[in-house]
Curated annotation (Swiss-Prot):
Activity modulation comment: Allosterically activated by GTP, when glutamine is the substrate; GTP has no effect on the reaction when ammonia is the substrate. The allosteric effector GTP functions by stabilizing the protein conformation that binds the tetrahedral intermediate(s) formed during glutamine hydrolysis. Inhibited by the product CTP, via allosteric rather than competitive inhibition.
Enzyme category, top tier: ligase
Gene responsible for this protein: pyrG
Miscellaneous: CTPSs have evolved a hybrid strategy for distinguishing between UTP and CTP. The overlapping regions of the product feedback inhibitory and substrate sites recognize a common feature in both compounds, the triphosphate moiety. To differentiate isosteric substrate and product pyrimidine rings, an additional pocket far from the expected kinase/ligase catalytic site, specifically recognizes the cytosine and ribose portions of the product inhibitor.
Region (Amidoligase domain): 2-266
Residues bound to L-glutamine: G352, L380, G381, M382, Q383, E403, R470
InterPro entries xref list: Class_I_gatase-like, CTP_synthase, CTP_synthase_N, GATASE, GATase1_CTP_Synthase, P-loop_NTPase
Transmembrane segments: none
Protein name: CTP synthase
UniProtKB keywords: ATP-binding, Glutamine amidotransferase, Ligase, Magnesium, Metal-binding, Nucleotide-binding, Pyrimidine biosynthesis
Organism from which the protein derives: Salmonella typhimurium (strain LT2 / SGSC1412 / ATCC 700720)
Length: 545
């Protein structure tokens, strides 16, 4: 089986939407029956984004196999059926780390280790490994052509195109075509200079995707084709749209998939985009709207919650309602009070780390519980809901997490290495013990209680969801909380760890330790988000009576 590669680069400015363009093209090719995957090569020196600030980098997307990756992999999974893994994302830091380990082991037999060939060879090896078993692999290069950080990756893909043969390699370059209101026309010069920069590295683009706030006229596309040495039919206009899910249809309408299949000599049927047409129809024709408050600590950069925001929109699609998301800083709840939570149809508290804003989240969970407002807590959102219930219902004054108050009287949430048994002895666990280390990452099984709301929502007794956390519900203090009325609706496959809690005498109060947003897609949605948005819609109707 021969694997074909499409290398995706960006020019002029960053944030042009290379990830969306690559994912949209992959969706079209998948709709033609091809086995497609996407890779992201990030030029930063961090080994992975796991320890990077969400405010600076955006969310960390967790794959099934537990890799902490770039948020673009979330876009990839929302557009195609193929699941991403740690083989789909690697960074400069990871490449250099691997090469340096080999050098220390003597794998290079005393050779002088250099960017070329050692770093570029390592990059090529990982691209080829990630592409095994697929018809087409799209490889997105992070950053912008001209950045010094990207040079080893660009050199590697230049070499790789020669290695595998140009008949199996395409270079697709995204570039900005700005509109100047004063001149009343779009300008192609930035694109010409961007392609010139790419040519200086030794890469001739085969396809140009022209990003603009409007459709790029045919005469301007012809001009770009002439000056950039690209066929006119390979100069594609990608204008701004009100929904990213319109991009596959936009690219297909200009024959991009036909051009690629012809270049790769792929004989495959026409793409059937009916599923995407249905998504677009549902998005454009809602029967109502709801307002959901998301109370977090990284709200100045919405991309920090990208998958949650998208999952809420997917929940809206499944209920034919538009979801308006109100981002609320949890510190504002602390300083201004819960009054700022009024007029919401539902409340969601997403994941997070650190003490800042936690008391505001706890107050938010209490407000939702006491006022019968639909509540969905994710990761930390479950932990604060548990702390709130322990304090205000179970009589455990000052209950907390050891993440925030290490010596609290009631550590209802703690590292699994900090649990104490019924005799008060610290339970010692390590990365070699059955429960693993202190960080749970990736897909794990969860058993649902038969009498739970989530059992009805999922329609199954066993589910698999992705995790990213260090702290767990402290089982040694759980009995007192359950006796006060909290329901444990889901436990880990070994029945050891609390995965889902519910408040039974509440219209809709669900909190989970895992991250359901990572498996929500526009075509399929997710049971928790669909149920949550439905509850928000019902709450709105009750309030209107």
């Amino acid at each position: 089986m021969t694997t074909n590669y499409i290398f995706v680069t960006g020019g002029v400015v960053s944030s042009l939407g290379k990830g969306i363009a690559a994912a949209s093209l992959a969706a079209i090719l998948e709709a033609r029956g091809l086995n497609v995957t996407i890779m992201k090569l990030d030029p930063y020196i961090n080994v992975d984004p796991g320890t990077m600030s969400p405010i600076q980098h955006g969310e960390v997307f967790v794959t099934e196999d537990g890799a902490e990756t770039d948020l673009d992999l979330g876009h990839y999974e929302r557009f195609i059926r193929t699941k991403m893994s740690r083989r789909n994302n690697f960074t400069t830091g990871r490449i250099y780390s691997d090469v340096l380990r080999k050098e220390r082991r003597g794998d290079y037999l005393g050779a002088t280790v250099q960017v070329i060939p050692h770093i570029t060879n390592a990059i090529k090896e990982r691209v080829l490994e990630g592409g095994e078993g697929h018809d087409v692999v799209l490889v997105e290069i992070g950053g912008t052509v001209g950045d010094i950080e990207s040079l080893p990756f660009l050199e590697a893909i230049r070499q790789l195109a020669v290695d595998i043969g140009r008949e199996h390699a395409l270079f697709m370059h995204l570039t900005l075509v700005p509109y100047l209101a004063a001149a009343g026309e779009v300008k192609t010069k930035p694109t010409q200079h961007s392609v010139k920069e790419l040519l200086s590295i030794g890469i001739q683009p085969d396809i140009l995707i022209c990003r603009s706030d409007r459709a790029v006229p045919a005469n301007e596309r012809a001009k770009i084709a002439l000056f950039c040495n690209v066929p006119e039919k390979a100069v594609i206009s990608m204008k701004d749209v009100d929904s990213i899910y319109k991009i596959p249809g936009l690219l297909k309408s200009q024959g991009l998939d036909d051009y690629i299949c012809k270049r790769f000599s792929l004989n495959c049927p026409e793409a059937n985009l009916s599923e995407w047409e249905q998504v677009i129809y549902e998005e454009a024709n809602p029967a109502g709207e709801v307002t959901i408050g998301m109370v977090g600590k990284y709200i100045e950069l919405p991309d920090a919650y990208k998958s949650v925001i998208e999952a809420l929109k997917h929940g809206g699609l499944k209920n034919r309602v538009t979801v308006n998301i109100k981002l609320i800083d949890s510190q504002d709840v602390e300083t201004r009070g819960v009054e700022i939570l009024k007029d919401l149809d539902a409340i969601l508290i997403p994941g997070g780390f650190g003490y800042r804003g936690v008391e505001g989240k706890i107050a938010t969970a209490r407000y939702a519980r006491e006022n019968n407002i639909p509540y969905l807590g994710i990761c930390l959102g479950m932990q604060v809901a548990l702390i709130e219930f322990a304090r205000n219902v179970a009589g455990m004054d000052n209950a907390n997490s050891t993440e925030f108050v290490p010596d609290c009287k009631y550590p209802v949430v703690a590292l699994i290495t900090e649990w104490r048994d019924e005799d008060g002895n610290v339970e010692v666990r390590s990365e070699k013990s059955d429960l693993g280390g202190t960080m749970r990452l990736g897909a794990q099984q969860c058993q649902l209680s038969d009498d739970s709301l989530v059992r009805q929502l999922y329609g199954a007794s066993t589910i698999v969801e992705r995790h990213r956390h260090r702290y767990e519900v402290n089982n040694m203090l759980l009995k007192q909380i359950e006796a006060a009325g909290l329901r444990v609706a889901g436990r880990s496959g070994d029945d050891q760890l609390v995965e889902i809690i519910e408040v039974p005498n509440h219209p809709w109060f669900v909190a989970c330790q895992f991250h359901p947003e990572f498996t929500s897609t526009p075509r399929d949605g997710h049971p928790l988000f669909a149920g949550f948005v439905k509850a928000a819609n019902e709450h709105q109707k009750r309030q209107a009576k």
